Amino acid sequence: LIECDEAAFRKASEFLPVECLVVNNIFRDQLDRYGEITHTLNAIREGITHIPDAVLCLNADCSLTASLAEKIPNRVVWFGVNVPIYTHAAHELSDAPYCIHCKTEYQYDYVTYGHLGGFHCPNCGYGRKTPSIAVTQILTAGADASDIVLDICGREYDVHVNLPGGY
């Protein structure tokens, strides 16, 4: 298991025998290194071209991450959160408010954080994929831990997460 910087992944993927790639999300926090979100996205996309046999585990809640599944031969496994994490989530803080394809503003059934959530474009139809691994309920959300219901391919599990907040 290797956690790799987005820009380094572009090159590292040429030399490592990658079996599985997990991409959680793409946020503007990479701007100090890459200048713009599209550069980060393109670095990951280029790296994926070197690993056509790897399984991609992609966050269905992130419109940018989800776009990585387009025009690739890789098998994709989707994960996500099917319910709002925060009742006060502010969509206006979005790093990606507009459709990556047609530039129409996304509509959301719910927002989990920033631009993550149940997004869809009312113009071209691009939208969140149905995840096979998903948080379906948040039972408790404490300062130190949370209890959730996790659905994995149709089977539900009660899970205690030893992390604070929406992690």
Language model region names:
Residues 4-112, 165:
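Flexible active-site lid/hinge loop adjacent to a nucleotide/diphosphate
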Residues 1:
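Conserved substrate/cofactor phosphate-moiety recognition/catalytic segment
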Residues 77-167:
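Adenine nucleotide phosphate-binding catalytic loops in nucleotide-utilizing enzymes
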